[in-house]
Amino acid sequence: MNENNIQKLQKIIEHYFIKQQNISKNNIDLNLRNTVQEVIDNLNNGILRVSEKINNKWITHQWIKKAIILFFTITNNKLMTWGNARFFDKCPTKFENKSEEYFKNRKIRIIPPATVRYGAYIANNTVIMPSYVNIGAYIDTGTMIDTWATIGSCAHIGKNTHISGGVGIGGVLEPIQANPTIIEDNCFIGARSEIAEGVIIEENSVLAMGVFISQSTKIYNRSTGHVHYGYVPSGSVVIPGSLPSEDGKSSTYCAIIVKTVDSRTKNKIQINNLLREYCN
């Protein structure tokens, strides 16, 4: 999609988003409906994405988030079926009409009862175990989303990344947050961890089981003694821990960077790549 078309879509979305409170489902402008659907279709196909790295900096396209919110504003709930189960929602599932050839050609594995909403992008050579991927999320190639993990709206999961069982990656629609959560390329997120509120996990990082990071979580580097917030530097190995209060009477949870990724760390998580090779 060329820049002129993107700017045209953005202009229309911005215009209608200002008037969101006045939009009625009984009288929706055709231009609005078509524009919103075009944005959602392009998110679904990976042509558009909510966040992208430009000049080594993550940029969030706020207008695309607004398009998703408008989609829910103008769309009615409808009955959906899966076997004997019944669902009632606004957003269809991504793969409901896809053929066997579609999955084979793209080397995508979807294990029941995984749910991927339409408007999420799933790249080639990916494995989606029984998990949940929300609208606007972007899952890049070579990545596995493991059992009972949840990928929130507009989250970005990079290439060759493993999101372990029960992990939660926060979204940005409910509640509305400024920036999506970003997991960059070649990361390993340990089971039952939670990353939310626009936190960025930079490439080649490994998080142990049960690491919780939000914007207010202290991230403590054991080697330097430095504390920062909102991101994990590239190549970090992170475990859950705590820091004492100034008076020594209590302690507060934090994420601790214990070292940088080395060959020993890589060997421990190499089994995931072997499993994917044999499963495709």
UniProtKB/Swiss-Prot annotation:
Its EC number is 2.3.1.117. It is found in: Cytoplasm. PROSITE patterns: HEXAPEP_TRANSFERASES. Gene3D superfamilies: Hexapeptide repeat proteins, Tetrahydrodipicolinate-N-succinyltransferase, N-terminal domain. GO terms for molecular function: 2,3,4,5-tetrahydropyridine-2,6-dicarboxylate N-succinyltransferase activity; nucleotidyltransferase activity. Its main location: cytoplasm. Substrate binds at R109, D146. Keywords: Acyltransferase, Amino-acid biosynthesis, Cytoplasm, Diaminopimelate biosynthesis, Lysine biosynthesis, Repeat, Transferase. Pathway: Amino-acid biosynthesis; L-lysine biosynthesis via DAP pathway; LL-2,6-diaminopimelate from (S)-tetrahydrodipicolinate (succinylase route): step 1/3. It comes from the Bacteria. InterPro entries: DapD_Trfase_Hexpep_rpt_fam (IPR005664), Hexapep (IPR001451), Hexapep_transf_CS (IPR018357), THP_succinylTrfase_dom1 (IPR023180), THP_succinylTrfase_N_sf (IPR037133), Trimer_LpxA-like_sf (IPR011004). It catalyses: (S)-2,3,4,5-tetrahydrodipicolinate + succinyl-CoA + H2O = (S)-2-succinylamino-6-oxoheptanedioate + CoA. One of its GO terms (cellular component) is cytoplasm. GO terms for biological process: diaminopimelate biosynthetic process; lysine biosynthetic process via diaminopimelate. Belongs to the transferase hexapeptide repeat family. PANTHER family: 2,3,4,5-TETRAHYDROPYRIDINE-2,6-DICARBOXYLATE N-SUCCINYLTRANSFERASE, MOLYBDENUM COFACTOR GUANYLYLTRANSFERASE. Homotrimer. This is 2,3,4,5-tetrahydropyridine-2,6-dicarboxylate N-succinyltransferase. It comes from Blochmanniella floridana.
